[in-house]
């Protein structure tokens, strides 16, 4: 009997606040010189006292509500004690037994992943270990920035489900504006707890893989650990409860330390911060501020006729969905572009151009109204799809497609005499194909269709060309 994976995630999001969680020190340090975004509290100097950041609390409440959690009416902070250079206070302020949110869920496709808790805490500094150097470098700019840590129940069963879950969490955080949630900047980090068991048997010993900073790394670490633990258990070995790191170059895990338990941290209530009471009225004010969430956006797109795959892709990308919504609203009343066709153009043709330029939609000169106009021109039969594709590079540079079509005379040719002349020329140039078609090989007609469309510069409607070509061939 094969083993089944039991996976839980711990996701850390850096909240998008102006200042750090317990002091007035600015929180947006990215790109700054090391140790330039610090203050006495960040440095852990004696006599400094924390003051809780209200903005961080409200962002955490909003995030908890988006995960279908219950927001606690009473919460408090505890000291999590440990000695490490990146924590100059020698403790982290976290929420131990009274998190700000608990008992939520997210639906990933047809599967539900339960959210155990989400709690606030301050981040640590950053240690860098130069190769072969007898020292380490410490940057405390990150220390004290607000984090929300979300912990799932062990409901995840595989790497792709974990990846889809993280993509959904990222989309929610970005839609709410609570976090940039960019793994490449360290603003979204993930720890993975993995164990194996056979169906009907107790769960096995779990390991924790720490500080995975990309969704791809999460998926690969899970795949590697499932494979490794399967080999160990299959050979009669035992899994030890270790904390593991992920070697991106070697694509494997390595032991960092033996896993600590809660007793090792000696939690106790923070004496310098009073407990926080959160009233129902405060919760409802936060709920009223919440924008449309990805799941709601997906349902809205489906209701307009967008296919499930495109609706999912759009709903998980904040920038693309904003651009799409703007394009969908563009134009005179009653003349909006077809929703599915617009999605196709944005996610296929436009996305291809952006990828070739190593850009995202916010960096492009493309205007939503211009993409909408391009799709409307196709819908109205004013231009063909081929002409639209030829125009797209210029439209991507900010050109108005309607102006380009008018100035260059690119409208669809409706003159059947011109189409018939192009057909006659193609048939005269390839009599062998004409004979094949008339002998019953109708597929050979495509060899005539292409030259006709080329002669018309892509400005003839394909269905008109095919109908008149069929008539000319006597079919």
Curated annotation (Swiss-Prot):
Example GO molecular function: ATP binding
PROSITE patterns: GATB
Pfam families per record: GatB_N, GatB_Yqey
EC number from the UniProt entry: 6.3.5.-
SUPFAM superfamilies to which the protein is assigned, alphabetical: GatB/YqeY motif, Glutamine synthetase/guanido kinase
Domain of life the protein comes from: Bacteria
Protein keywords: ATP-binding, Ligase, Nucleotide-binding, Protein biosynthesis
Keyword Cell membrane: no
GO biological process terms held by the UniProt record: glutaminyl-tRNAGln biosynthesis via transamidation; translation
Catalytic activity: L-glutamyl-tRNA(Gln) + L-glutamine + ATP + H2O = L-glutaminyl-tRNA(Gln) + L-glutamate + ADP + phosphate + H(+); L-aspartyl-tRNA(Asn) + L-glutamine + ATP + H2O = L-asparaginyl-tRNA(Asn) + L-glutamate + ADP + phosphate + 2 H(+)
Subunit structure: Heterotrimer of A, B and C subunits.
Family: Belongs to the GatB/GatE family. GatB subfamily.
Protein purpose: Allows the formation of correctly charged Asn-tRNA(Asn) or Gln-tRNA(Gln) through the transamidation of misacylated Asp-tRNA(Asn) or Glu-tRNA(Gln) in organisms which lack either or both of asparaginyl-tRNA or glutaminyl-tRNA synthetases. The reaction takes place in the presence of glutamine and ATP through an activated phospho-Asp-tRNA(Asn) or phospho-Glu-tRNA(Gln).
Protein name per Swiss-Prot or TrEMBL: Aspartyl/glutamyl-tRNA(Asn/Gln) amidotransferase subunit B
